[in-house]
Amino acid sequence: MNYFRILYCSVLLFFSFFSCTSAAVSNHPIHWGFQKNNNHQPPDAGKEWNELLNKYGAFYLGDPSKKEIYLTFDNGYENGYTSKILDVLKKHDVHATFFVTGHYLKTAPDLVKRMVKEGHIVGNHSWSHPDMTTISADKIKKELDAVSDKVKELTGQEGTVYVRPPRGIFSERTLALSEKYGYRNIFWSLAFVDWKVNEQKGWRYAYDNIINQIHPGAIILLHTVSKDNADALDEAIKTLKQQGYTFKSLDDLVMEKMFESPFLY
């Protein structure tokens, strides 16, 4: 996948020179969210948001006609469970994307190195986890580039192509700027309240949320700070594979979209 990422970064940077300025687009903050479906059908973000994400090459969903799913984790800080999560992923030969912050890179460098060594993608969750709609264009670039540079320094991975905006807050301006700087925003179509470390409810809570919400093309968001997630992951992966789902990487998703619509993505 490293060769694809190098090629993709080059292509994205090339087209960024021809991007329109972000000064003319809206900076109205949008909080990512959707009405959950429990009938194994993908949620619909609505025509306006779908068009906005497509305009800037962002994703929240894969192909809803295929039982292919994408496992992603947000790593704001280390809470002692990432090693177990990595062990489970290795056991099942499943690759994921881990969106890390500057704090995580500074405090858990060995885990970040392990992620890349074991075939996972390290994504960008910004250096200091700000609301991107409240900071300048220069600051947005610094937030993203600092993570990307540190990941490359630690692991050799060529850039953090994929960005998950902190707290899911974004605007058309932040989408335009991140694309201009060579990044692609990745949202999600399956998530639940799992980040409250003092309100964990047991592995079954996480397992049921994943299995009840799963749908073709799902981009799954989990937080590594959750003991429930770490304890549920093994059984969840077993069940999903038994149901015929295949785990794919974000590189697979983007490559597929680029071949389908080369001038859009």
Curated annotation (Swiss-Prot):
GO terms for biological process: carbohydrate metabolic process. Residues 67-248 form the NodB homology domain. One of its GO terms (molecular function) is hydrolase activity, acting on carbon-nitrogen (but not peptide) bonds. This is Uncharacterized 30.6 kDa protein in fumA 3'region. Belongs to the polysaccharide deacetylase family. InterPro entries: Glyco_hydro/deAcase_b/a-brl, NODB_dom, Polysacc_deacetylase_ArnD, Spore_PdaA. Residues 1-23 form the signal peptide. Pfam families: Polysacc_deac_1. It is an enzyme of class 3 (hydrolase). One of its GO terms (cellular component) is membrane. Its EC number is 3.5.1.-. It comes from the Bacteria. Keywords: Hydrolase, Signal. The keyword Thylakoid does not apply.
